[in-house]
């Protein structure tokens, strides 16, 4: 889990903590006097579907999309398929990083066709950054500690 990576200003795990932090972050993002930029990272987003954290997370995502702050949401590809409001809100931005995607995943997830590539051309950390229907191939670094 990303929680173990450290370096976060605030961390929540478990539905109650996630719900509370989502509400606090929404208030901070909507407050024009908040200084700096906030990056919100949600790991395993699909774990919060149809639970107490669902609506607060939808509100948070909407607030981030209307601001200059950043959202990073993580889930397995299969989890992005259903059209729950929480997932739809993230996908509607049509911006994302798809690592080792199948050709169809760009269309399914971000409404952007991706080129067919051999699996060997997409080692760990390689994929496509997609924004507003355009894509670029990217390679993320492997950080060793």
Give the ranges of each region predicted by the language model.
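P-loop NTPase catalytic phosphate-binding loop
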Residues: 1-95
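Phosphate-binding and hydrolysis-coupling loops of NTP-dependent motor/remodeling domains
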Residues: 5-8, 81-145
């Amino acid at each position: 889990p990303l929680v173990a990576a450290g370096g976060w200003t605030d961390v929540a795990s478990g539905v109650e903590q996630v719900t509370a932090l989502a509400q606090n972050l929404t208030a901070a993002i909507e407050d024009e006097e908040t200084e700096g930029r906030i990056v919100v990272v949600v790991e395993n987003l699909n774990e919060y579907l149809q639970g107490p954290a669902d609506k607060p997370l939808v509100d948070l995502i909407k607030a981030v999309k209307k601001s200059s702050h950043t959202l990073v949401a993580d889930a397995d590809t299969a989890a992005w398929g259903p059209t729950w409001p929480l997932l739809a809100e993230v996908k509607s931005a049509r911006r994302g990083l798809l690592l080792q995607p199948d050709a169809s995943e760009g269309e399914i997830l971000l409404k952007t066709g991706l080129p067919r590539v051999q699996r060997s051309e997409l080692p760990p950390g390689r994929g496509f950054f997609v924004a507003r229907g355009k894509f670029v191939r990217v390679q993320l670094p492997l950080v060793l500690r």
